Swiss-Prot record:
GO terms for molecular function: alpha-(1,2)-fucosyltransferase activity; galactoside 2-alpha-L-fucosyltransferase activity. The chain crosses the membrane at residues 15-28. Keywords: Glycoprotein, Glycosyltransferase, Golgi apparatus, Lipid metabolism, Membrane, Signal-anchor, Transferase, Transmembrane, Transmembrane helix. Residues 1-14 are cytoplasmic. It is found in: Golgi apparatus, Golgi stack membrane. Glycans are attached at residues 188, 282, 308. Catalyzes the transfer of L-fucose, from a guanosine diphosphate-beta-L-fucose, to the terminal galactose on both O- and N-linked glycans chains of cell surface glycoproteins and glycolipids and the resulting epitope regulates several processes such as cell-cell interaction including host-microbe interaction, cell surface expression and cell proliferation. Preferentially fucosylates gangliosides GA1 and GM1 in the antrum, cecum and colon and in the female reproductive organs. It comes from Pongo pygmaeus. Its main location: Golgi. The gene is FUT2. This is Galactoside alpha-(1,2)-fucosyltransferase 2. Pfam families: Glyco_transf_11.
Length: 343
């Protein structure tokens, strides 16, 4: 029997084409969904694109940050400690936006910023640090760690000194302004070859040290000894004094040698000018506080610091170790504690 095969009718052909098209689209969507899932991280672990270029694949696990508390010197210590400990533990480091706004206008820092909206989505593990390095800090557990405390000790980061100095390189305009000021100074009619930065911390410390910490701030006697130490070792040095108590300095620092200049503006809210002047000097005389410690660390050269400025039973010594704050090669001059003993 001859069977005649008739072609599909027009509506049937359209129906088959429709089914084929829908099936194809469905399978493509399924494949795309699988590919997208491979690239997406869970919601609580934000993707931070800025790390992909700076860090190798083996270092992209987790996020480490640190609290941004205190003024310039404190935040420099926090930055350097985060930089060193994150590297030591093989974790990527990010700084809070507040820290970036404090440091970035002055220094060429490189750590990426962790914005508050991103930080709020991360299940942080807070990890408190003492103000000195401990062996356990080499093995801090956790991928999402927020370091806390006021760390400012060379024991955390001195093995990375070159890198830390690079991080705290002044912007050109900040450095040039300081150098321009120093070039204009003279001692007895000639331009000096040795500049000694002097930082005198006063302000709140004048009351906080004796009342809270059983300690003292630098007095007239200490500063005279420190200046004479440099005068005995260098020919015609010039002393560039910065302070948040400049009126006291002008009354108590001996200027009879015509080698003392009162500089800077002492404005704690905008410390770049004072700090830059100190770091561009050859040597440093500091009193107390992290501002002076960092100025000396960046300047290099000889450093004189106020030593033993608390009573032996001071609660300050529970959170502060002098040997972890002052480099071994720095020279300490003991403070006069007699005002404390009178009370």
């Amino acid at each position: 029997m001859l069977v005649v095969q008739m072609p599909f009718s027009f509506p049937v052909a359209h129906f088959i084409l429709f089914v084929f098209t829908v099936s194809t689209i469905f399978h493509i969507q399924q494949r795309l969904a699988k590919i997208q899932a491979m690239w997406e991280l869970p919601e609580q672990i934000p993707v931070l694109a800025s790390t992909s270029k700076a860090l190798g694949p083996s270092q992209l696990r987790g996020i480490w940050t640190i609290n941004a508390i205190g003024r310039l010197g404190n935040q420099m210590g926090e930055y350097a400690t985060l930089y060193a400990l994150a590297k030591m533990n093989g974790r990527p480091a990010f700084i809070p936006a507040q820290m970036h706004s404090t440091l970035a206008p002055i220094f060429r820092i490189t750590l990426p910023v962790l914005h508050s909206t991103t930080a709020s989505r991360i299940p942080w593990q807070n990890y408190h640090l003492n103000d000195w390095m401990e062996e356990k800090y080499r093995h801090i557990p956790g991928e999402y760690v927020r370091l806390t405390g006021y760390p400012c000790s060379w024991t955390f980061y001195h093995h990375l000194r070159h890198e830390i100095l690079q991080e705290f390189t002044l912007h050109d305009h900040v450095r040039e302004e300081a150098q321009k000021f120093l070039r204009g100074l003279q001692v007895n009619g000639s331009q000096p070859s040795t500049f000694v930065g002097v930082h005198v911390r006063r302000g709140d410390y004048v009351h906080v040290m004796p009342k809270v910490w059983k300690g003292v701030v630098a007095d007239r006697r200490y500063l005279q000894q420190a200046l004479d130490w440099f005068r005995a070792r260098y020919s015609s040095p010039i002393f560039v004094v910065t302070s948040n108590g400049m009126a006291w300095c002008q009354e108590n620092i001996d200027t009879s040698h015509s080698d003392v200049v009162f500089a800077g503006d002492g404005i704690e809210g905008s410390p770049a000018k004072d700090f830059a002047l100190l770091t561009q000097c050859n040597h440093t005389i500091m009193t107390i506080g992290t501002f002076g410690i960092w100025a000396a660390y960046l300047a290099g050269g000889d450093t004189i610091y106020l030593a033993n400025y608390t009573l032996p039973d001071s609660p300050f010594l529970k959170i502060f170790k002098p040997e972890a704050a002052f480099l071994p090669e720095w020279t300490g001059i003991a403070a006069d504690l007699s005002p404390l003993l009178k009370h």
